[in-house]
């Protein structure tokens, strides 16, 4: 599904099971880090306008300096202090190289199909990252008839969010519809379905302030109970499976946690090997 962390999982696989990122890839991510900073600032400003949150200082509504004008001397000390901050110095240094965590947290929309190959023991894995947005799905749904397993990612934290491409559609409802169509598709009749309910760290914080029942009235538990809310969404996906021969293997994940992903992917490998032995 869109905005679920698929690309982050693929990055983790490169870090855990491959040789990591080559210099050309790291340089590309360096540019993306800077782009994400600008995008984030723009989103904050747009959100303030949408929510009608005024700036504390009305003078910030219009720039006090026009192009070509020098900065007033009163800005010197604050800018000097900001520039001296170790984090800022690291990021904007000409020798700045993104760390693994920087790369994992970079955001760039996936378009088309991106393949990652890595070796795990005697096995060679080919993983395909596909765009999750509606416009991307028609490009890949028919391409994977013979895959060993489908790793389906959904952002469990998106239960109260709308789609990027459709502000009137709920992310979780959309993910449920997509999972239903893939799980029961003619292309994946004999394919193992591994479900990653991702961004569990964000979900844990969200339920404290955003009631699940507000968006899913059929939830009858405690809105702030982590175990009850996660179980509710896990069961929603599992119940969509219409085949008695097919198992759904759910996992709660945080795609930026390398140690957690290493452990979970060990379990996924066991599932895939078991499936292969069954098919012999």
Q: What does each model-found stretch correspond to?
A:
Residues 20-39, 94-122, 136, 279:
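Switch I (effector-binding) loop of TRAFAC-class P-loop GTPase G-domains
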Residues 1:
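P-loop (Walker A) phosphate-binding loop of NTP-binding proteins
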Residues 8-96:
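P-loop NTPase motor core
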Residues 4-5:
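Conserved glycine(s) of the Walker
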Residues 70-75, 79, 85-103, 108-114, ...:
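Conserved GTP-binding G-domain of TRAFAC-class P-loop NTPases and closely related GTPase folds
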Residues 119-140, 158-162:
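Switch II (G3) loop of P-loop NTPases
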